[in-house]
Amino acid sequence: MSLFKARDWWSASLGEKEEFDQGCLCVADVDNSGTAHDKIIVGSFSGYLRIFSPHPLKPGDGMQAEDLLLEVQLRDPVLQVEVGKFVSGTEILHLAVLHPRKLCVYSVSGTLGNVEHGNQYQMKLMYEHNLQRTACSMTHGPFGGVKGRDLICIQSMDGMLMFFEQESYAFGRYLPGFLLPGPLSYSPKTDSFVTVSSSRQVESYKYQVLAVATDADSRKENEQQKMGAGKKVVADWILNIGEQALDISIVSFNQTSFSIFVLGERNFFCLKESGQIRFMKKLDYSPSCFHPYSSVNDGTINTLVGNHNNMLLVYQDVTLKWAAQLSQTPVAVKVANFRDLKGVIVTLSESGQLQCSYLGTDPSLFQVPKVESRDINYEDLDVEMKELQRIIKEATKTQDILPKMEKDDDLTLVATVLPDLDSVSQAVDGEVESEVIPSVSVKLCVRSRLTLQKAVLLISTPAPLALTQDQFIFDSLEPGVSKTASASVFLKGNYPPADLEGSAVVSYSKPTELNPEGVPRIVQCKFRLPLKLVCFPVQPSKVANHKLTIDTNKPPVNLINLFPEFIDQVEEDQVSVVGFQLLAGQKVTLLASKTSQRYRIQSEQFEDLWLITREFILRFQDYFLKQGIKDFTCSFSGPVPLQEYFELIDQHFELRLNGEKYEALLSERAVQFRAIQRLLLTRFKDKTPTPLQNLDTLLDGTYRQVIGIADAAEELQRNLFRAFTRLKSATQLVILLIGLWQKLNKEQIAILEGTFLPLLKDGQELGWEESVDAALSHLLRTCLSKSSKEQALNLTSHLSIPKDTSRLKKHITLLCERMSKGGRLSLSADSGSQQAAEMQGTPINPSVS
C-alpha cells in the first residue's frame, strides 16, 4: 500500500450498472477548439458516448452540469473510441467509434451560447462502415506513409485485419496462426503493425507485406494462383515473451528513440524497432493498464502503470519513481492537458468511475474507529462462562468422529452369494490359461424406508477378480419396496487373488429441513466368495517345497466335513488328504494327521498357501461353532518362514527399481525427441532450404524407442501389480502365522495388519517397502523397544524408495525376535517402557503366551 494517495482534481460517476474497458477512454481536442485543451471522450458497453471538459471551481470538486459537453445514446455497444484525421479533404480531428458490427466517424462541434446555459455541442455522422465480421479493436495512423490523414485498421474476433482508407474499404488480411485476438498498435516509423499472438509472441507485420498479400475477402484462390497474384503474410520479426499481453503502446518523443512498450501479465517490456528488448521490468503485482508519456530527463520515458490493488505507479524506464493510491481499479489511464492544469492523470474504472487526479503528498490515512466502552459485569460473565463450559462438556462426552447411526437405517443392503457356480460361465476377456473359468452370481437386495431418488450401487472385488457389471443406478426407491441387482464374479487375471472378500456400497441423498437437496449417505455390506471360484479339486501331491503345520486342541476332523465340494463321496469313512489346484497358481495339498491333532498345508509356491490356509481355519471355526464347542483354538509352533517371505519382497522391490530405470530412460528419450523436433522445425522455417542431415531418420528412430520403452514400462507396471498381489497374499499369511504363534488377540492382529498392509495400491512415489519400514520402526521404537534409548530415536519424516531391502528385512526379523521374547503389540503411550522392562529379563518360550 502506498503512503500517498492520488490527489483528486475532478471526478464523475458515469451511469448506473454500465461497464467499461480499456478502449472506452480517449483524450483529445475533439472539437478542434484550437486551444490545445483536451476533452475526455468515454464510451460504454451500454452504448452511451460522453464528452467531458472538466472545470472544477476548486480541486476535488465533483462534476458540474457544464462539464458534460455531450451525451449520446447509440444503438450498439461502444468497444473503442479514437480521435484522428479520418475524413478526406480536411485535416481537422474527427471521432471514430467502433461497434461490434459497425465503424462510425463523427464530427464534434460546439456553438457559443448567448444565454447563461453555456455552449451547445452536437455530433454529426460523417460516414459509417458496416462490418462483415465481429470487431475486437482498432488502431489508426498514416498507413503507407500518407500525409495529412489517418487510416483505420480493425481487428476482428476471427483474426482478420480490415483496412479502411477513410470513406472506403481497402482490403482485409488474415494473421497467420491466429487463435485469439490480442492488443494491436501501429508504428509510424517502421510502417508496421505490432500485436501479441496466442503463442505469447510479439509479432510485427509490415503494411506493404499485408497490402500485397493474398486478399482475405476473395475466395477465388484458384483464379488468383493462375494470375500469379498474392503473397503469403510473413512477420517482419517475432519476439517470444512467454506470457499474454494486456496492451501495446508505441511512442517516439523528441528526446528519446523509437520504443515499443508491451504490458504483460507479470512483466513490462520496452522493445526497439527491430524487436530487440531495450529493457524489461518484472512486476510483483497484476497490472490492469498502462500509459507511456514524455519524461523531463533526456533519453528516458515515464510510464504510468495501474494494478488491481488500486495503485498507480510511475516508472522512469525501470526505476519506480512514485506510487499513489487510487479509489478504484483503473482499466484505462491517460494523460491530458486542461485549461486550468496540465499533465492531469485521467483514469477510468470498470464500473464507470472517471477520475482526474495529480500526484502529491496527500497521505492515505486510516483511523481505527473508537470502540464503544461499557461497564463489565463480572457476575454475568461467570454465568455465561459456566454455561459455555457445560455445553462443551456435553459435546465432548462422546469421542466418535462420525455421527451415530440411527437404530433403523433408512436403507438396507443385503448381499447373497449363490451356493452353486453358474451353469454357464459368465467370464469374458479372461487371461487365465484354463479351459473353463467358473463364475458365481452375487445378488444384492436394496430396501428403503423412505422415498429416495438416484441411488447408486457399486460393487467391488479384489483383483484379479472381475465383475460382469459393477455399477447399478436406481432412479427411485419407494418405501417398503425391494429392488435387486445381480452380477457374476470370475477370475480375470492370470494370478490368484489376495482375498475372497467383496464389498457393495449404496450411495444416496437424504433430504433434511436445512438441506432439501439431500445429505450424502452410504450403506455398505461385505460378502465372501466361494473357494471353488479360484480352484478345483485335483489329486494330492506328496512332496512340496513349502510346508506349514497347524496344531489344534481338538481331535482330528474328517476333511470331507470341511471341504465337501472338493471331495467325492467315497467308501472310506475318514478322508485325510485333499488336493486343490488354483486356476492361476500351483497345487496346494491339505493333509490331516490320523494320530495327532496336526494338519499340514504344502505347495510349490509360498504365497499360494494363503487362500487354502485361511479357508481351512475359517471352516474349522464354523465346524466347531455349529457343534457348540467354543474353546477350539489353532496354533503354530514356528518358526515363521521369513526367508520365503523375503524372496517375494526382493522380487517386488526389484520390479520397483526397474520401474524407476524405465521412467528415467523414457524421460531421456523424450528430451532427445523434443530436441530433434526443434532442430527439424528450425530447418523447415528457414527461408533458405537446407539438407535435413538425416534428422528425419533420427526422429523416426527416437520415436520408435519412445514407444518401445513406454510399452515395456506398461508391461512392467502390470508385472508389478501381480507381484504386489502375491506379496500381499504372503504378508497376510505371515500375519496369520504370527498371530497363531503368539496367540494374539484381534486388536494386536489389527496392529500387525496396519503395519504390514498400509497401502491398498502400490506406486513409485510411495511404495510398500518404505511404508512398512516406517511402521516397523515405530513399533520397534515404542511398544517393542528394548531400552529408553531406542524410544528417544527420531524417525525421518520423509519417505522415499530405499536403496535395498536389508533394513526392512532386519526390522521384520527384530519384530519376530522381540515378540518371541515377550514383547506385545500396543498403541498406548506407556506400553514401551513396560515392554522394555519385561524384555530385559529372561527370554520367554515362544509357544507360551
UniProtKB/Swiss-Prot annotation:
The alphabetized list of GO BP terms reads: cilium assembly
Q: Where located?
A: Cell projection, Cilium membrane; Cytoplasm, Cytoskeleton, Microtubule organizing center, Centrosome, Centriolar satellite
Q: Which residues form the signal peptide?
A: none
Q: Which InterPro entries match?
A: PHTB1_GAE_dom, PHTB1_N_dom, PTHB1, PTHB1_CtH_dom, PTHB1_hp_dom, PTHB1_pf_dom
Q: Could you tell me which Pfam families the record lists for this protein?
A: PHTB1_N, PTHB1_CtH, PTHB1_GAE, PTHB1_hp, PTHB1_pf
Which superkingdom? Eukaryota
Region described as Disordered: spans on this chain: 825-849
Kindly list the GO CC terms recorded for this protein. Answer: BBSome; centriolar satellite; ciliary membrane; cilium; cytoplasm; membrane
Q: Where is the composition biased (Polar residues)?
A: 828-849
Chain positions covered by the region annotation Seven-bladed beta-propeller: 1-407
* Keyword annotations of the record: Cell membrane, Cell projection, Cilium, Cytoplasm, Cytoskeleton, Membrane
**Site (Critical for protein stability): which residue positions?**
141
Q: What does this protein do?
A: Required for ciliogenesis.
Q: What is this protein called?
A: Protein PTHB1
Q: Native species of this protein? A: Xenopus laevis (African clawed frog)
